[in-house]
């Protein structure tokens, strides 16, 4: 699941299959943790199905609406559901807390479906908490896929039923549409993806001076 290249195990990057890059950095504005998987060329139908399932999983969790008191262990199924529907699983949590200029993995907040004696899955999601949303599919000897954004918990409406909460995606990077099967997504999920890419385009275009880069971004964030 985590790969460190050695002379014995390194792989040549070729114009085919998928490439997963998990990256991040420390900035005065905060700590980033982001993963994107890219189609470097032709990919198989299975790889596209898995890529799209991971995308749907990420979007399902990012667009959750829930009452205050909900824990990460209760929300995890929203992400894991599309992948469980395929009869497979990723053997790790869906997300972890992120600190501010300290550890990129910091509790107590997380998303995972089962309890562990070394973790606190009973932590309630609170406004302002930053948690990663990173479902994946990992097929040994074949391919690995992960799409990761950071989410910040926000207050929504409060009424007689209680305080509703949701998430704001604060990661701003295109998702490779060349590996997506639109018909595998529900209309709602396609709308969520298009809304996210509109946000990415609106945020990043003003920061780009090069016409070629701006044209690339418009294409990378096109509606499907």
PLM features: what roles do these ranges have?
Residues 1-224:
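Active-site neighborhoods and metal-handling regions in enzymes and metal-associated proteins
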